[in-house]
Every structure is written in structure tokens, then in C-alpha cells.
Amino acid sequence: MDAHAATLLRVSLAVVFIWFGILKPLGYSVANELVERTVYWFDPGWFIPFLGWWEVLIGVTLLVRPWIRVAVLLLLLQMPGTFLPLVLLPDVCWVRAPWAPSLEGQYIIKNLVLISAAIAVGGTVRPDIRRGRDLPARPPANV
């Protein structure tokens, strides 16, 4: 399982970002109204498609191993904004703050998993640094 975990996590993240991202410029994302109400200072006519294509770019860069660092950077720049509705739209995001999020609030809070997964995937870029150059990747089987 360990041999494929990072690849599966990376591809899964890519699928989510490409899929959910492309829905925004096409006008099919259930999050479009939430985005529009949250960042009301931007014209949604250009901002929602821009955000969608940004997410697609995150997904595509996750699929190309040498670009993983770019993907993580793009994701970390984008993700803080996804939490804004929890503060700016409490009537939409909470049934009873801070313990009972609405469906929209749950949709936002699950982004913690996406951030953590991206950090885990980013950690696979240079495993020799994480483990030390002279250490074996795994302990011997008889230990």
C-alpha cells in the first residue's frame, strides 16, 4: 500500500481540483453563489472563472511530478480564501457556531483535508531530505 499511497493521493487531489475547478467557469458549481457573496468586492463575471481556472491549474500541476511544488504553492495561496465564508457569512455556514456547521460550512471545513493532503504530497518531492541521505527508505524486514 505504501508504494502507491502518495501517487493515489496526488492523483485524487488533482481530480478534485480539476473537476470542481472546471465547474466554476461553466456555471455549474454549487460554490459559485458562495464565492460571489464572499468576495463581493470582485466582479463575479471574471473572478469566478479565474478562480475555477486557478483550481484547474492546481490539479494539472499535481499530475506532473516536477510541478508538485508549484501545485502546492498555488493551493496554499488559494486555500485561505476558501475559509472566508466561515467568518463573513456565518448565517450561511453555521447552524450553531462554532460546533454545528451547515452543509456549506462542512464543504469549507473539509478543505483542511485538502491542505493536509497537499502538504503530504509535497513532502514526497524530496524524500531524501526528509529521511536523511544515508538512511534506507525503510527499515530492514527483520527488525
Report each predicted region and the residues it spans.
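Membrane-interface extramembranous regions
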Residues: 1-143
